Amino acid sequence: MANAASGMAVHDDCKLRFLELKAKRTHRFIVYKIEEKQKQVVVEKIGEPTESYEDFAASLPENECRYAVYDFDFVTAENCQKSRIFFIAWCPDTARVRSKMIYASSKDRFKRELDGIQVELQACDPTEMGLDVIQSRAN
């Protein structure tokens, strides 16, 4: 169903891959992009469970907006193994204004399609989503 505000639909594969990440843990991350011509959000890249946070960060384009989901594993101060699912809205300052507007207006609706997001992060440059930021937001 298209979003009235931005006219964006969400491809079924987006939800399916997210469920695989959440329930089966078969992916470390998923990068989503908006296909403007088809007016829908689609899966652009899927990260294997063995890939690192650096691999994930490197998969985001330098000058284009993206949505991403990252399954972050960490150990608490009490030495407990935990996991948090992050939703990251990547919107670099160097992206086209039109692209930033489309991603901003579609974000909330898209995020609602992904049931199980635990932490949301908005990032305009790599320092705003560095591993230190992820670690502090996970706790």
Curated annotation (Swiss-Prot):
Disulfide bonds: none annotated. One of its GO terms (cellular component) is actin cytoskeleton. GO terms for biological process: actin filament depolymerization. It holds the Pfam family Cofilin_ADF. SMART domains: ADF. GO terms for molecular function: actin binding. Belongs to the actin-binding proteins ADF family. The keyword Endoplasmic reticulum does not apply. The lineage of its organism: Eukaryota, Viridiplantae, Streptophyta, Embryophyta, Tracheophyta. CDD domains: ADF_cofilin_like (cd11286). InterPro entries: ADF-H, ADF-H/Gelsolin-like_dom_sf, ADF/Cofilin. This is Actin-depolymerizing factor 1. Gene3D superfamilies: Severin. Actin-depolymerizing protein. Severs actin filaments (F-actin) and binds to actin monomers. Residues 5-139 form the ADF-H domain. Keywords: Actin-binding.
